[in-house]
Design a protein with these regions (language model features):
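Residues at beta-strand starts and edge strands
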Residues: 50, 75-77, 93, 130-131
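A short, N-terminal "cap"/entry segment at the start of jelly-roll beta-barrel domains
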Residues: 1-67
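Conserved metal-binding segment of the jelly-roll/cupin
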Residues: 102-126
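Short Gly/Pro-enriched loop/turn and capping motifs at secondary-structure junctions
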Residues: 84-86, 119-121, 140-142
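A short beta-strand-loop-beta hairpin characteristic of the jelly-roll/cupin
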Residues: 80-107, 145-147
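A short beta-loop-beta micro-motif enriched in histidine and acidic residues
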Residues: 62-77, 85-92
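Double-stranded beta-helix
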Residues: 1-19, 123-149
Length: 149
């Protein structure tokens, strides 16, 4: 392959998420199937790359780490994206998400911005009529969290 100044920025493979490595397996006990987990510049291969996780929601449920309210020292987007080409704003599912002490129900394509230091979660998937995308990203390079006390 030719040498390239920018080839390292095309990320096609990432390690599994350490908090729930089984989520890469389609038939795991996790409600989603992970595709990308970018943290720490993909083990230093892409310095400066922001934190990113992409998943496809396949079934109902939650994970222990998403049951606990937590904060980050970076701002984070939580994106819920419908996949119906006839109505891409219909999530075809229902997600319960807590931000601070507010419980919200998500049934439409939604972007939630969570400022640094704001507690969020639990996140519980109550209904999946059609798989939809769940993407999280933040303006930090390393994923870290602190459980809310």
């Amino acid at each position: 392959m030719e040498q390239s100044d920018y080839g390292k920025f095309f990320i096609t493979e990432t390690p599994r998420h350490p908090d729930h490595p089984q989520s890469r397996d389609r038939d795991s006990d996790i409600p989603w199937c992970d595709t990308f987990y970018v943290s720490g510049g993909v083990n230093g291969q892409v310095p400066g790359a922001y934190y990113l996780e992409t998943c496809m929601m396949l079934r109902t449920g939650s994970t222990p780490d998403l049951q606990v309210p937590h904060t980050h020292d970076f701002g984070e987007y939580l994106l819920f994206l419908g996949t119906d080409p006839d109505d891409h704003f219909d999530l075809h599912g229902e997600v319960e998400l807590w931000v601070g002490d507010e419980k919200r129900t998500i049934t439409r394509t939604t972007a939630v911005f969570v400022p640094a230091g704001v507690p969020h979660c639990p996140l519980v998937v109550h209904r999946v009529d059609r798989p939809f995308m769940f993407i999280t990203t933040g303006d930090g390079t390393d994923y870290s969290r602190e459980e809310d006390k």
